Design a protein with these regions (language model features):
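ATP-dependent carboxylate-amine ligase
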Residues: 1-35, 46-48, 64, 80, ...
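Short, basic phosphate-binding NTP loop
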Residues: 2-105, 120, 226, 230, ...
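Adenine nucleotide phosphate-binding catalytic loops in nucleotide-utilizing enzymes
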Residues: 6, 41-43, 62, 67, ...
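Short glycine/serine/threonine-rich phosphate/pyrophosphate-binding segments
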Residues: 12-16, 114-118, 265-268, 319-320
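Phosphate-binding loop of NTP-binding sites
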Residues: 19, 23, 72-200, 204-217, ...
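Short acidic low-complexity segments
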Residues: 49-60, 136-139, 398-406
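Redox-cofactor binding/interface segments in oxidoreductases and associated redox assembly factors
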Residues: 64-67, 149-150, 168, 202, ...
Length: 435
């Protein structure tokens, strides 16, 4: 059986391709994007061929998997239909594969990629597990019992999963092109949580997780005292964070970790919660958490002399705030410069005021033109990066051509924040720093 993934360079699609390849299937893919993306490196390592033209080889034994970014009218999908091939959407195929294992899903507006990656790292080292992470990382073996996946709420895609544990890192309004309002989001998460076979594990510090309508047991983690699992005696330093964990007021263990920011404490508590219920030893869990190297494009650092470059996927105001605060914790004596690309016109319109507030937490903010993704400018008249830049305390527009504005900030920590890699800017600034 051969699988043909249309839109294979996407983070989720590329990870699914890796998993199908690991399980012994022939895998090829197609993508409109002819530029090199960070997801391609792992595909190349596995020998998975990527086509960017029509010279692919598909036949009656091919199953087609369509990325949600690929429309039904795309020529590759039209061709597949003309050949009467079976076509699955990404989440449908992932559900078919993952539901064969003891599934743990991680959902949430923020933190799900890091939490999934962190949980996979620990479980992989404590008995083995399969995993699919939204940073383009995927691995599977038929011998493993557990499967950890990042579950996306967009278009309610996470409803196809039947997890043992359903994790919710937080609930917030995002994907404003789909969800009608906050209640619609809460309803979607309630449906997702009620698919859990064992239990729901949710961040109880988040007010919206307390509003879920559930018929399954739920276990809350957080920093607030009214949670089932609580981090106490927290100390943040430039070396990381340490804290004690109590489960229903009983001491579980001490954790001293090289992580930065309150959000990382919460992400870690989600992982510890699963480990506790799987009866794993706290010291072993702590030892494996310590060796976590981070998820792709999540506070990914490059150090050149006294300048720190950070590549991060952050695009929602909550995520941008978390990255800036983590930077200040780790490098308290450095200027923090944010280079931000707004993602989609609908998000920019909905979150402009919040983005202004969080970007003002940086010492300097540069803003690129909006990345439209699937949207069109004509549908959002008057929505552009100027509506953010005009209200920043110390902000200005930047383009690939005006990258030299960054020269003034040699010696600072410079945060490149965007779901799409701001490659040209980073490369030009990196070349300058290496001269």
């Amino acid at each position: 059986m051969k699988y043909y993934l249309v839109g294979i360079k996407g983070a989720g699609m590329s990870a699914l391709a890796l998993i199908l390849n690991d399980l012994g299937y022939e895998v090829i893919g197609y993508d409109d994007d002819k530029n090199h993306e960070f997801t391609e490196d792992k595909l190349d390592e596995r020998g998975i061929k990527i086509f960017t033209d029509e010279n692919n080889i598909i036949d009656k034994n091919t199953i087609v998997i369509r990325s949600t970014a690929i429309k039904e009218s795309h020529r590759e999908i039209v061709k597949a239909k003309s050949l009467d091939l079976k076509i699955y959407e990404y989440n449908e195929m992932l559900g078919k594969v993952a539901n064969m294992f003891e599934l743990i899903t991680v959902a949430g507006c923020h933190g799900k990629t890091t939490t999934t990656s962190l949980l996979a790292h620990v479980l992989k080292n404590m008995g083995g597990c399969n995993y699919l992470i939204g940073d383009g990382t995927g691995y599977a073996s038929k011998e493993n019992k557990k499967f950890v996946i990042e579950a996306c709420e967009y278009y309610r895609h996470f409803l196809v999963y039947e997890p043992n544990y359903a994790i919710i890192t937080n609930i917030e309004l995002d994907h404003v092109d789909y969800f009608k309002d906050m209640q619609d989001v809460i309803d979607a998460y309630s449906e997702y949580a009620n698919n859990a076979e064992k239990m729901v594990i949710a961040c109880g510090d988040d007010p919206y997780t307390r509003m879920l309508e559930l018929n399954k047991p739920i276990f809350y983690y957080g920093i607030d005292e009214d949670n089932d699992i609580v981090a106490k005696n927290i100390e943040y330093t430039s070396d990381g964070v340490e804290f004690d964990v109590f489960v229903e007021e009983n001491y579980y263990g001490h954790f001293d970790l090289p992580f930065y920011g309150k959000h990382m404490v919460l992400n870690t508590l989600a992982v510890i919660s699963v480990c506790y219920y799987e009866r794993m030893d706290a010291k072993e869990v702590s030892k494996n958490l310590k060796t976590f190297g981070g998820a792709e494009r999540r506070f990914e650092e490059t150090i050149i002399g006294d300048t720190i470059l950070v590549d991060d996927y952050a695009h929602h105001p909550t995520e941008v705030k978390a990255v800036i605060k983590a930077a200040r914790q780790k490098y308290p004596n450095k200027k923090v410069v944010a280079v931000f690309q707004p993602h989609t016109f609908s998000r920019t319109q909905a979150f402009a005021e919040d983005l202004i507030k969080v970007l003002n937490l940086a010492d300097k903010a540069f803003v690129l033109d909006i990345f439209p993704s699937r949207e069109k400018q004509e549908d959002f008249p008057g929505i552009n990066s100027d509506i953010i830049v005009g209200k920043l305390n110390n902000g200005e527009l930047i383009t690939d051509e005006s990258w030299d504005k960054l020269k003034e900030y040699k010696g600072a920590i410079v945060l490149f924040l965007s779901p799409k890699q701001i490659q040209n800017l980073m490369e030009k600034f990196t070349e300058y720093l290496n001269c």
